[in-house]
Amino acid sequence: VEVEAEGAWSGTLRLSADGRVWEREVSLAAGLQTVELDAGLEQPRLWWSRGLGGQHLYTFRAELLASGRQAAARQARTGLRSIRLVREKDEWGTSFYFELNGVPVFAKGANHIPLDSFVTRVTRERYEHEIASAALSNMNMLRVWGGGIYEDDAFYELCDEYGILVWQDFMFACSLYPGDEAFLANVRAEAEQNVKRLRNHPSIALWCGNNEIDTAWSHYLEDAGWGWKKNYSPELREKLWADYEALFHELLPEVVGRLAPEADYWPSSPMQALTRDANQHAGKRTSSGDIHYWGVWHEAEPFERYTLNLGRFMSEYGFQSFPEARTVRSYAGEREMELLSDVMLSHQRHPSGNKLIKRYQSMYLPEPKDFVSFLSVSQVLQGEAMKYAIEAHRRRKPFCMGTLYWQMDDCWPVASWASMDYFGRWKAIQYYAKRSMKDVMVSIDGTKEGEVDIHIVSDVPEPIDGTLHAALYDFDGKLLKRFSAQAKVEANATAVVWSSSVDGLLEGADPKRTVLKADLAADGRVLDSKLHYFVPAKDIKLSKAMVTIREVAGSNGTAFTLETDTLAKQVALFAEAEGVFSDNWFDLIPGIPVTVEFLGRGAAGRAFAPASPGRITVQSFADWIEL
């Protein structure tokens, strides 16, 4: 217990929690000091991240008493857990994963930026909407990006409650910083204040020195980095690097080690390790440390590169889309609804972002019939890109043990990498992420030429003994083939449970009008389902689908069943009310209905609860392209 006393003082320190009380006599001197008190809980309830267990929180209260009267008191709500960043030599290089209460955790989530450009406008409700959305999307980690802010207490309290681990950057990003004594003293005070403020939150998993500065400067590789070094003489380079090391290799780790000795510190994201040689800096594909992979998007590489360029922990990667039309119309009039209008370019912070979205759309998806349709198609494109990445990362477990895409939220209404727009409306990618981050996931991999592999990825601590049921359909819903296979997966592991050549699977069926459906069943229920197509989406032969929607009897207008007469791709439901559907932006096969529930934002005093969506608009690719 840390105590600051104005002068000498003697009395009793009392600590209480969960009905237990511990006391000791203390004598304090003037100034700041730490007093230790042994306290033990028999059979404590541990704090777990979402998906591994409950998020039990204890309230510890400390009091200073003199003659039975309270002189000072403070309480903290915290969870009991052990967490460490495991970096150990293995068959591939050096591991990089988090171990919570002795259990290896595959980190699934996104990067968090400030929720508003004007942070005073952010409310607890907005924080809860984001963090509840992360939990509902099967995430277990958010990375607080070093180019933003040290977040409000409410953010961390909610991460504690929802079981979302926090990778916490110190607030340094994409720039070099001074190393003079006055600046370092200022940084030390800021770091100490924030480490003390946040160290009792069980959600804090890691302290990271900065965002991308190590890789941007790449001190030990002359031709690497972002080109900064060429602007400086050798002498000035050494001075700048010495300043960098003083801040990120000395000051910040010392603060963390002194004030939060059980916490881990990582100097910069991304990097391989603190080796002080050329092996320190991260690349596109490394066997140690973490990676920010931007070949897809910034360098216009194809989605398929996600399966090749990965490492031990993917802490940043992403792809842009536009928000839905309702959000775009909050900043653009009808005359400005064009890809390269001044308003659209002003609401795009990447120098060629809108053109890049269009370029990728031409590579992978059919041509939208107008700009409003392009908005929806761009969201499908983003979702497909992130599905490619997330599932590639998860299939490579335990080599890869983390996937955090850029980014979860937006600070203003804009075309961006976010999975929720400024108003908190889920884009298609949020539903894609929810499906691709399920604790038990079916992943169908068609990236090998002429082959299809079906993987089961499990993040649960128990083995799975189930059955894979798969079927081949044409787009009219005709069953072409059915087969099954045993699906056994060890606890917290992955397995390929079925493989086939494409030719052997199709047996002459038209690849442009055929879909594979795979379901994993165990203990009498379906754990996950996935669809797979045999040609890119732009090449499949779609017909005009008639999608019907009906209310589920007895649901009080909160649940709905959808059916179609021919394959409907990317069925998107838009509700009048603010909220989310249990599933959305999915494909419908004739004869296989899908039932969804609407969860209203803030309904029944909760972040999400069943509610009426009001008017529902149903769209699909058939509405966005010319057929």
Labelled PLM ranges:
Residues I131, V195, P253, Q379, ...:
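Generic hydrophobic alpha-helical scaffold/packing signal
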Residues E161, Y177-T275, F423-G424:
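Active-site neighborhood of glycoside hydrolase catalytic domains
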Residues V1-M141, G283, R395-R396, C400, ...:
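Secreted/periplasmic carbohydrate-active enzymes, especially glycoside hydrolases
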Residues S82, H112-P114, G146, N211, ...:
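Residues that line or immediately flank small-molecule/substrate-binding pockets and catalytic motifs
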Residues Y156-L158, E181-A182, L221-A224, Q280-A282, ...:
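Short, glycine/charged-enriched secondary-structure capping and boundary segments
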Residues W207, D214, L247, L251-I464:
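Substrate-binding clefts and catalytic carboxylate motifs of secreted carbohydrate-active enzymes
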Residues V86, P114-S117, I149-D152, A173-L176, ...:
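Flexible loop/turn segments at secondary-structure boundaries
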Residues P44-R45, R69-S175, F183-L206, L345-G383:
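Active-site-adjacent substrate/metal-binding segments within catalytic domains
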